Swiss-Prot record:
The keyword Transferase does not apply. Expressed by the venom gland. Has a weak inhibitory effect on voltage-gated sodium channel Nav1.2/SCN2A. Weakly inhibits acetylcholine esterase in vitro. Increases interleukin-6 secretion from macrophages in vitro. Has no antifungal, antiviral or cytotoxic activity. It comes from the Eukaryota. Negative results: has no effect on voltage-gated potassium channels. No effect on voltage-gated sodium channels Nav1.3/SCN3A, Nav1.4/SCN4A, Nav1.5/SCN5A and a sodium channel from B.germanica. It is found in: Secreted. This is Venom peptide 8.
Length: 5
């Protein structure tokens, strides 16, 4: 992902 995986 992008935010905190």
């Amino acid at each position: 992902k992008i935010w905190r995986s």
